[in-house]
């Protein structure tokens, strides 16, 4: 018997997914894409399989801004166990070393946290998706190869101690793109002299979605099974442009912009801008230089 093919359709928008623990970000994307029957989709930066929380998924024309969301500010809550280091810097790895945990109070932890705030140099976990020689580090580590994880500069905006119940604590971290919370926790453990690893991690928000209304995969499936229109479950692409100044163009200039032509006007605001038609339809992203020259970068077909 021949099985009928599932018809995939064009969807344009952003799904604010509450990723469950135990699956990769790409697996979560593929499940959501299959449920929505969306032709084209992409995620905005990986969450570890252990982690839960906000994973913005972009579909259709919204995939053109996925890279911008990848580079945006993010916030996490991390549950930490002091006294033990692991191969993965989280609870999924094998134990490397166990050390006694000193007597700590909140003031002592708060006193060392500033060492991890600002522009800092951070060594990535060896079990990470960063690539060396075209291959993820975790693939090399799983084969037992010696992995020299890169040291990179990242930006940590804030770290707040939420709970301290030795040997456990909970941190709230706000940071820039590329920051590994596992590495932050590992480094905090070394500063405290006892080692540490993450036992749970939840991403609270990704700019510009600071108060996200997230959907779980189960809730998504239930809504679609109940007959909800897939478009009604997605945010419009324009919501992902909230962090950029808006530049409205008249019909003539907009037509030139859509063709990829450069436009000059000294009244244009310098920097990256989101370009709109006069009736509020996003046309793309552009960069305005100091001479007022608008250069199209990403064009939307909406």
Curated annotation (Swiss-Prot):
The gene is truB. It catalyses: uridine(55) in tRNA = pseudouridine(55) in tRNA. Keywords: Isomerase, tRNA processing. NCBIfam families: TruB (TIGR00431). It is an enzyme of class 5 (isomerase). Transmembrane segments: none annotated. The keyword tRNA processing applies. Pfam families: TruB-C_2 (PF09157), TruB_C_2 (PF16198), TruB_N (PF01509). Responsible for synthesis of pseudouridine from uracil-55 in the psi GC loop of transfer RNAs. Its EC number is 5.4.99.25. One of its GO terms (molecular function) is RNA binding. It comes from the Bacteria. HAMAP family: TruB_bact (MF_01080). This is tRNA pseudouridine synthase B. The lineage of its organism: Bacteria, Pseudomonadati, Pseudomonadota, Gammaproteobacteria, Lysobacterales. The active site is at residue 48. CDD domains: PseudoU_synth_EcTruB (cd02573), PUA_TruB_bacterial (cd21152). GO terms for biological process: mRNA pseudouridine synthesis; tRNA pseudouridine synthesis. The keyword Glycosyltransferase does not apply. It comes from Xylella fastidiosa (strain 9a5c).
């Amino acid at each position: 018997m021949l099985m009928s093919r599932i018809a995939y359709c064009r969807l344009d928008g952003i799904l604010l997914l509450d990723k469950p623990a135990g699956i990769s970000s790409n697996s979560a994307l593929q499940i959501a894409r299959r449920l929505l029957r969306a032709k084209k989709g992409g995620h905005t930066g990986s969450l570890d399989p252990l982690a839960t929380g906000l994973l913005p998924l972009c579909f259709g024309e919204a995939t053109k801004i996925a890279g911008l969301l990848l580079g945006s500010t993010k916030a996490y809550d991390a549950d930490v166990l002091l006294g033990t280091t692991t191969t993965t810097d989280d609870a999924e790895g094998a134990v490397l070393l166990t050390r006694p945990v000193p007597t700590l109070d909140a003031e002592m932890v708060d006193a060392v946290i500033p060492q991890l705030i600002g522009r800092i140099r951070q060594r990535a976990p060896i079990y990470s998706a960063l690539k060396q020689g075209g291959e993820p580090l975790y693939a090399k580590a799983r084969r037992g190869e010696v992995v020299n994880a890169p040291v990179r500069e990242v930006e940590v905006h804030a770290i707040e101690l939420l709970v301290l119940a030795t040997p456990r604590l909970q941190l709230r971290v706000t940071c820039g793109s590329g920051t590994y919370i596992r590495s932050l926790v590992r480094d905090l453990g070394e500063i405290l002299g006892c080692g540490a690893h993450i036992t749970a991690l939840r991403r609270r928000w990704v700019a510009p979605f600071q108060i996200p209304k997230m959907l779980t995969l189960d809730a998504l499936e239930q809504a679609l099974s109940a007959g909800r229109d897939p478009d009604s479950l997605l945010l419009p692409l324009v919501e992902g442009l909230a962090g950029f100044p808006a530049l409205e163009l008249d019909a003539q200039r907009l037509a030139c912009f859509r063709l990829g032509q450069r436009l000059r006007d000294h009244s244009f605001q310098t920097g990256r801008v989101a370009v709109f038609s006069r009736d509020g339809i996003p046309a793309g992203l552009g960069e305005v230089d100091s001479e007022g020259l608008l250069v199209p970068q990403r064009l939307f077909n909406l």
